[in-house]
Amino acid sequence: MMSIRQRREIRATEVSEDFPAQEENVKLENKLPSGCTSRRLWKILSLTIGGTIALCIGLLTSVYLATLHENDLWFSNIKEVEREISFRTECGLYYSYYKQMLQAPTLVQGFYGLIYDNKTESMKTINLLQRMNIYQEVFLSILYRVLPVQKYLEPVYFYIYTLFGLQAIYVTALYITSWLLSGTWLSGLLAAFWYVTNRIDTTRVEFTIPLRENWALPFFAIQIAAITYFLRPNLQPLSERLTLLAIFISTFLFSLTWQFNQFMMLMQALVLFTLDSLDMLPAVKATWLYGIQITSLLLVCILQFFNSMILGSLLISFNLSVFIARKLQKNLKTGSFLNRLGKLLLHLFMVLCLTLFLNNIIKKILNLKSDEHIFKFLKAKFGLGATRDFDANLYLCEEAFGLLPFNTFGRLSDTLLFYAYIFVLSITVIVAFVVAFHNLSDSTNQQSVGKMEKGTVDLKPETAYNLIHTILFGFLALSTMRMKYLWTSHMCVFASFGLCSPEIWELLLKSVHLYNPKRICIMRYSVPILILLYLCYKFWPGMMDELSELREFYDPDTVELMNWINSNTPRKAVFAGSMQLLAGVKLCTGRTLTNHPHYEDSSLRERTRAVYQIYAKRAPEEVHALLRSFGTDYVILEDSICYERRHRRGCRLRDLLDIANGHMMDGPGENDPDLKPADHPRFCEEIKRNLPPYVAYFTRVFQNKTFHVYKLSRNK
């Protein structure tokens, strides 16, 4: 399969406009230029410098990632088919629709081909705009047609440069979020440096370019930055409206570009629910954010031709349940501590029950089964019952859906990110507990949320939001490695904010009786500067070596297969095989598929299980009948799957099929007592012997070191 081989030779103190001056900092303020005009100029200068650095660091990150991609594959030198093969698995499937739109004679015909597609799933016509999140490919194809770039920029470069450009926006949004939280752009600079030096754990865009998360996460970061600003107290009405607009647009674009949007926003809704229940942010602002989430999802639902999976999402059920519970349960935030605690537990129970009730009702009305594999996976993952379900086990056995590896923390510690994160997290968690206890105890408190009596600890609403956000997404990342990119990028933001926060250093210095306004200033600037110098000293040489290392794409077997398909099979031929390979077949050859990697449809999952019987212990006539039921003309067998050794016993694809079919697994090891020996040998092995029962149904037409292609007989 595809591999990579070595290429052949051929400072001043800043003042934030939104931070109210504290009495302890009066002396520091007096050192700033005096007079209203001077302060305004100083503020403008700070914003200009910080904004310029934000744009520069974002662009540099984008160029850095694009250069790594070029150096790793020699993308500018390889053939078109090799470029397309480099878009592995589902990435190739998504890119194929961009290519399809560009190859259509007109935009109208391109849209029609997506809405009435009969090549992605054989013998079926499906609406791709309803089934998949591919509006970004549609939009990009329209831009490429309209803009005057066709003469000097190939379509594939227009596509990948757009994704790398979004990475610039992503890093800039992280920078701004940290700046908003701490009040200094130095914090944003540190967050960006940490993002780059921890690249292995913060992004995978350079080798999975078309992946949905690479489109979605930049908009998610913009949304978090906008929410952080929105939760500040005493915003001007115009600022508040503009911020709400930014939140809505970023939430909508995030929802439109990733099929897992509803689960990420459910985590956000849980953050809002927690803070609202503990009186740590204004209820009216939480209501606005709940409403924006629902509105964005419903708008996406309309654009996706009323995709039932969106309507049946837990997020919509949860947010509606919160609104209903608020109406039913009055005076939630009054009474003594025990009284309020009891009301809070009752409120939590009511919202949970309403959420499950509404979700079940909606799913029964819509007859929705598209997301049941996710809940089967979660049930098995958290030990709520063993399962032999093929789909659930397919996820359980993938490393990306396993627990976060322990060596991740070693890499994060090398850059000091993990140590700084734990330091800041520990302090803010303690403060959050104190503030929550105070809020629950003091029901007569008439002060605004986030403010407490002078001399007590304080946690601003925007800080509280980012604290609970990082905790919940941390649990998500620890349980599912694929979701670590949502957490590690926010780790950079949260850790850098804490090291540059005057409130954090004030609390820490007061606790050890070393408080002094000058010391706060010294600590909040010297610590991040020292860390930046350390990062430059330790990682700059390695980054330069990485940029100078030249490799090239090398996958001759797959290239040979794609060229053979293009030259020797009819345009309307139907191909069966593994999901990952068939995505490449569609992109490189345009042939019709039996199945594909977009696994969010129940009928497709059933079809995939049937096609995968080519790797199970089944009779040739049974496999032939299953494949022909989907109109299959050719089947591609892969030695890397048939003789797989990458996964442990019980997690190889052939083992999952054996268990699902009730057959004993191959090789030494235990089997469940009720599993029985199969009546037939493994199909993918036995077919290569060219025995009469197999030759009667299958004729080998292509073979190399990796792939075997068989043509199915039609008269059986």
Swiss-Prot record:
Glycosites: 118, 704
CDD domains in the cross-refs: Dpy19L3 (cd20181)
Intramembrane segment boundaries: 185-197, 216-230
Membrane-side (Lumenal) residue stretches: 65-154, 257-262, 307-308, 360-414, 486-487, 540-716
Alphabetical list of InterPro entries matching this protein: Dpy-19/Dpy-19-like, Dpy19L3
Ranges of the Cytoplasmic topological domain: 1-43, 183-184, 198-215, 231-239, 280-289, 324-338, 438-465, 500-522
GO BP of this protein: protein glycosylation
Chief location bin: endoplasmic reticulum
Record GO cellular component, one term: endoplasmic reticulum membrane
Source domain of life: Eukaryota
Bilayer topology annotation: Multi-pass membrane protein
Keywords linked to the UniProt accession: Endoplasmic reticulum, Glycoprotein, Glycosyltransferase, Membrane, Transferase, Transmembrane, Transmembrane helix
Segments traversing the membrane: 44-64, 155-182, 240-256, 263-279, 290-306, 309-323, 339-359, 415-437, 466-485, 488-499, 523-539
MF terms (GO), sorted A to Z: mannosyltransferase activity
Compartments (UniProt record): Endoplasmic reticulum membrane
Pathway: Protein modification; protein glycosylation
One Pfam family this sequence matches: Dpy19
Listed EC numbers: 2.4.1.-
Free-text note regarding domains: The C-terminal luminal region is essential for C-mannosyltransferase activity.
Similarity-based family: Belongs to the dpy-19 family.
Name of this chain's protein: Protein C-mannosyl-transferase DPY19L3
Name of encoding gene: DPY19L3
